[in-house]
């Protein structure tokens, strides 16, 4: 199965989210109980993949700001005191899609949208707060670097853009 079989679009108010199950209850509950509210108050923008009208994957993006002193010196060097970023607040695939290599495609979809947004509104980093070691390993595989002492990983938007230009 390829990501070409899915429609990637913004979350619609009428989307039925009740059958989404990623095997991560906190991600499933947030989608069902909070995604529409986050949209309405503009605290997060959720994009979904649909297949035959059903939501089978999603990610949520939000604005974020780092304090330079919260970053390792090698990452924050040359930055202002407050550094604009994009937070990948949520990213999940329905459990029936696990193990098919689609997590990377979903992250690439989110990354493309971040690159476009960063052309309009400045963002130096992409940040993700991981739930566990498996998620940390996933993001590390795609070039994200951990911030010591946290469950947070970061990647420069310029590095993302470079990777997509190289493809």
For the regions a language model picked out, list residue spans one by one:
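Conserved N-terminal entry element of GNAT/NAT acetyltransferase domains
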Residues: 1-23
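Conserved GNAT-fold acetyl-CoA-binding loop/helix
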Residues: 16-33, 44-45
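Conserved beta-hairpin
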Residues: 42-63, 70
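Conserved acyl-donor/pantetheine-binding loop and adjacent beta-alpha core of acyl/acetyltransferases
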Residues: 58-90
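A short, internal acetyl-CoA/4′-phosphopantetheine-binding micro-motif in the GNAT/acyltransferase core
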Residues: 89-99
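Conserved acetyl-CoA-binding loop-helix of GNAT-fold acetyltransferases
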Residues: 99-113
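Short glycine/proline-centered loop/turn elements that form peptide/ligand docking sites
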Residues: 107, 132-135, 151-158
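Conserved active-site alpha-helix within GNAT-family acetyltransferase domains
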Residues: 115, 121-149
């Amino acid at each position: 199965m390829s990501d070409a079989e899915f429609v990637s679009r913004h979350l619609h108010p009428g989307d039925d989210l009740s059958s989404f199950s990623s095997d991560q209850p906190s991600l499933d509950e947030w989608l069902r109980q909070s995604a529409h509210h986050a949209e309405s108050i503009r605290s997060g923008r959720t994009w979904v993949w649909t297949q035959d009208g059903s939501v089978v994957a999603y990610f949520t993006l939000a604005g974020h700001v780092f304090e330079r002193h919260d970053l390792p010196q090698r990452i924050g060097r040359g930055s202002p005191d407050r550094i604009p970023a994009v937070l990948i607040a949520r990213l999940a695939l329905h459990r029936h899609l696990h193990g098919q290599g689609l997590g990377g495609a979903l992250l690439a979809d989110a990354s493309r949208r971040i690159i476009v947004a960063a052309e309009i509104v400045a963002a130096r980093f992409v940040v993700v707060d991981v739930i566990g070691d498996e998620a940390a390993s996933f993001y590390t595989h795609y070039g994200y670097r951990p911030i010591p002492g946290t469950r947070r990983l970061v990647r420069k938007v310029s590095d993302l853009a470079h990777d997509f230009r190289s493809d």
